[in-house]
Amino acid sequence: MPRDYQTEKEKCKTFLQEFYKDDEIGKKHFKYGVQLANIAHREQVALYIDLDDLAEEDPELVDAICENTRRYTNLFADAVQELLPQYKEREVVHKDALDVYIEHRLMMEQRGRDPNEMRDSQNQYPPELMRRFELYFKAPSSSKARVVRDVKADSIGKLVNIRGIVTRVTEVKPMMVVATYTCDQCGAETYQPIQSPTFMPLIMCPSRECQTNRSGGRLYLQTRGSKFIKFQELKIQEHSDQVPVGNIPRCMSVYVRGENTRLAQPGDHVGITGVFLPMLRTGFRQVVQGLLSETYLECHRLVKMNKSEDDELGTEELSEEELRQITEEDFYEKLAASIAPEIYGHEDVKKALLLLLVGGVDNSPRGMKIRGNINICLMGDPGVAKSQLLSYIDRLAPRSQYTTGRGSSGVGLTAAVMKDPVTGEMTLEGGALVLADQGVCCIDEFDKMMDTDRTAIHEVMEQQTISIAKAGIMTTLNARCSILAAANPAYGRYNPKKTVEQNIQLPAALLSRFDVLWLIQDKPDRDNDLRLAQHITYVHQHSKQPPSQFQPLDMKLMRRYITMCKRKQPAIPEALADYLTAAYVEMRKEARTNKDMTFTSARTLLSVLRLSTALARLRLEDVVEKEDVNEAMRLMEMSKDSLLGDKGHTSRTQRPADVIFSTIREMVPEKGARSVKYSEAEQRCVSKGFTPAQFEAALEEYEELNVWLVNQARTKITFV
């Protein structure tokens, strides 16, 4: 059915002028009228027409826009251009070069024109040159996001809504929209609107004067009078869960212009609304590939999406009720247990993973960067759910990458030099660690990686950058990500007869870069095995964790809370400095006496600081407290105990009471009163992984032996 586009334009005008929504007090709020006033005064550039609003007024017009988007974009733009003078209440203060250029031309033309001749002087200017705004459509909420491979020939020219992951982003460059030429003979100006990616510049002057005199004036391009717009090309690829069995993920080129540029980075999950169009080939390529045509998506709206759900990346604050739900008592245990609730046990491992998601605080004293991100290595026997924990963290983190050891080369992890198909230049393409910037990079089967590829990670784990010198490109890329690695011991299973170094077989330089190295052993234990088997069979039957008193938190809620925690920048107070120093010296002393311990260096102290600041962030506090340091020390101690296994308990004194006694004895000052504060002794023992009940039992036992006395107020332990 043929359409009268003039009446359609009038409909567009009516909608822009008359559409309103009632606010809370019942007052009419003209949504687009306010935006038109902002555009008229140059306070706003992009105007987004929400098709849900238009559907309330005229559903037929919405269908027409979705079918023939390019035409209606121009109709709406013309309607806005005609309406702008009504909304202009004052002169624009800051004029750009094009304003001055056009005003000057209008004045020159009025002087040289016959006063009796009635003619609109702006007619000769193309509408694209006069527009100072961009117009885009926002797809109706009823339209479902499509997969890249479902966008086919029947979608050409229509408004489509697709989801995918950005794999490549070009630099933003100026793109010519209107070319302005000046004649060297008559001085007349000629304008050439450009629609396609390439164009043939005009050479001969088409003005009446040159045609009459046959002077053959030549045209020269005036860049000051031409109009340019920002242009960027994205490559998006469909999600791995959208790819059919045995197929390779499909890609699509997206052309982004104006205000939509610089919104996405490689690795972002995005939803794009745009017009699906064929690419017009000209020149030599048309001769070579005359029958083939490329397609692309002209972007109208680009939003970042969550990784696993279809909703936009929520930046809204948590409500008070949601905060109360999270921060009730035992919230630390509750948050940790909400990580992979289907997996049984591993409470301390989950706590460490929670701290990895929150992260510590970055420090940059005088340009030297001390990282805040926490790196964790999970090592263990086969079948202890290491990979499941990794894949859950990959889904939970707002920004993450998942790779495996054998499937990743050093270049694939860091950066590769590629040839740009558009310009032919050599460009850098970021690998998994660059794509996971400000997020988490999960590397499974870490022990299976080639040594040459593993060395690529060393710089990232401490300096958080990737330095490149390839193909004439010398640069440094940011890779501020936490690394979560999972590895199997050297002999398939952990061999208790071998030392820790022989079992792990990773270089000390790499091990010291991991803040927490956790060994998860699969030891036979009847009660534990029974509970685990019941848990697994229930999960297998019902596809959810067994019912319990504890209700795990929703993944979306956790993601928003973690984002909120990351905004905090807690500092370590002066009062805790001595306590931390003493604790570190104690750890070094213990490492010296126990030959089988992991490598303890100054990085271990930094690890404690990172874990402490992450715990303070989790409580939404600005200052680190003693409890945070004790919990950080406890986690470090538990991870070391996991490495020592049975050997550790035999190498130490057998009973916990004896270890607690030696710990308290070491706290006694060499000179002065032979007494220790009760609270300090308890904190030191708890930080070493003992429970308060074990501490109390040891006190009573040695008090009966008359080794020490505890006063009635239980504030002081005095040695006899």
From Swiss-Prot:
User: What EC number(s) are associated with this protein in UniProt?
Assistant: 3.6.4.12
Residue ranges of domain MCM in the record:
331-537
Biological processes, Gene Ontology terms: cell cycle DNA replication; DNA replication; DNA replication initiation; DNA strand elongation involved in DNA replication; double-strand break repair via break-induced replication; premeiotic DNA replication; regulation of DNA-templated DNA replication initiation
What does the entry report about post-translational modification of this chain? Ubiquitinated by traip when forks converge following formation of DNA interstrand cross-links. Ubiquitinated via 'Lys-6'- and 'Lys-63'-linked polyubiquitination by traip. Short ubiquitin chains on mcm7 promote recruitment of DNA glycosylase neil3. If the interstrand cross-link cannot be cleaved by neil3, the ubiquitin chains continue to grow on mcm7, promoting the unloading of the CMG helicase complex by the vcp/p97 ATPase.
Per its UniProt record, what InterPro entries does this chain match? AAA+_ATPase, MCM, MCM7, MCM_CS, MCM_dom, MCM_lid, MCM_N, MCM_OB
What keyword terms does UniProt attach to this protein?
A: ATP-binding, Cell cycle, Chromosome, DNA replication, DNA-binding, Helicase, Hydrolase, Metal-binding, Nucleotide-binding, Nucleus, Ubl conjugation, Zinc, Zinc-finger
Task: Spell out the PANTHER family in the cross-references.
Answer: DNA REPLICATION LICENSING FACTOR MCM FAMILY MEMBER, DNA REPLICATION LICENSING FACTOR MCM7
Task: State the family it belongs to.
Answer: Belongs to the MCM family.
| Protein name, UniProt field | DNA replication licensing factor mcm7-A
Which species does this protein come from? Xenopus laevis
